[in-house]
Curated annotation (Swiss-Prot):
Cofactor(s) the record lists: pyridoxal 5'-phosphate
Pathway involvement of the protein, from the record: Amino-acid biosynthesis; L-histidine biosynthesis; L-histidine from 5-phospho-alpha-D-ribose 1-diphosphate: step 7/9
Gene: hisC2
Principal EC category: transferase
Signal peptide residues on this chain, from the entry's feature table: none
Self-association and partners: Homodimer.
NCBIfam families given in the database record: hisC
This protein's name: Histidinol-phosphate aminotransferase 2
Family: Belongs to the class-II pyridoxal-phosphate-dependent aminotransferase family. Histidinol-phosphate aminotransferase subfamily.
Domain of life: Bacteria
GO biological process: L-histidine biosynthetic process
Modification N6-(pyridoxal phosphate)lysine, positions: 210
Organism: Gluconobacter oxydans (strain 621H) (Gluconobacter suboxydans)
SUPFAM superfamilies on file: PLP-dependent transferases
Amino acid sequence: MSRFWNRRVRDLHPYVPGEQPKVADLLKLNTNESPHGPSPKVLAAIRDAASDDLRLYPDPTAAVLRDTIAARFGTTSDRVFVGNGSDEVLAHAFRALFHDDAPVLFSDVTYGFYPVYCGLFEQPFRHIPLNDDFAIDIDAYTGDCGGIIIANPNANTGIALPLEQIETLLKRHPDRTVIIDEAYVDFGAQSAIELTHRYDNLLVVQTLSKSYALAGLRVGFAIGSPELIEGLIRVKDSFNSYPLSRPAQAGAIAAIQDTDWLADITARVIASRDRLVPELQNLGFQVLPSCANFVLVHHPAHKAGAIAAALRERAILVRNLSTPRIQDWLRISIGTYEACIRLTDALRDILSPRS
């Protein structure tokens, strides 16, 4: 605690990211990164952008990237906002679109950045408990609120909501912004982007970090009504007018355009997930149904922390989260076929009875 910190900083509870240790032969299954590399077209575009033009500022409006996203998702560029990763996009959305005269609503088990944003921007919030089966209870999202954010598929559980339930929320709260955070949507859920033309209170946020295999590039985007997008732009231009570098914009354009690569690597992740789930169940784990690039698992006979520690001794990282309802669960990112074999072999050894 420093005497130089202001009150707001003293009261912050910052987000804690998954660890990124430098260990030889490390198998990282803790931060939901892609096990496959980005499109070769992306790498070529980034190399081409690394020219003498780096002496110049990038386009502050990222016009070509926004046009590319608009074309890809059947909308117009005035409905598209881009930022330095979806975390920045979400932060701007909390600041611009959520009101502080009533609590922001989100699940008790979800992305850990949501309460951090509320703390930073001094917005009240209320956790809405998941059902006993860890599904989002739409009927509980009632009453006055400052806005609503739903991760779909839900962060940490991987369970997805159907679009008709999202529509229920939009109709119930027509004068409040509803944000659907679709970081994992490409792994088996249905995007709500098609609803943005019918509901002016809907903002859909996606990232290139997961399914596009570009966590290191830091690009995210939002799609919504022009008035929502203008609110985000006002906040961006009051904070950082140039959030995306020239290489980032070039790489993101190539990634959005290479739909074949996206389809291939997401299909491979889904296939690995479908193989891993029964293997984990055969080892005694309860596995929640996942539409994401991870699974949330619980073993009734073994503590999650002990399993995570034993895996770490074998240079395998998984995430043992501190959220109260899932503190005895493990979130395991989906790796390659070979990575999943290494994981299950290690778990089999850890869980086997010792004589």
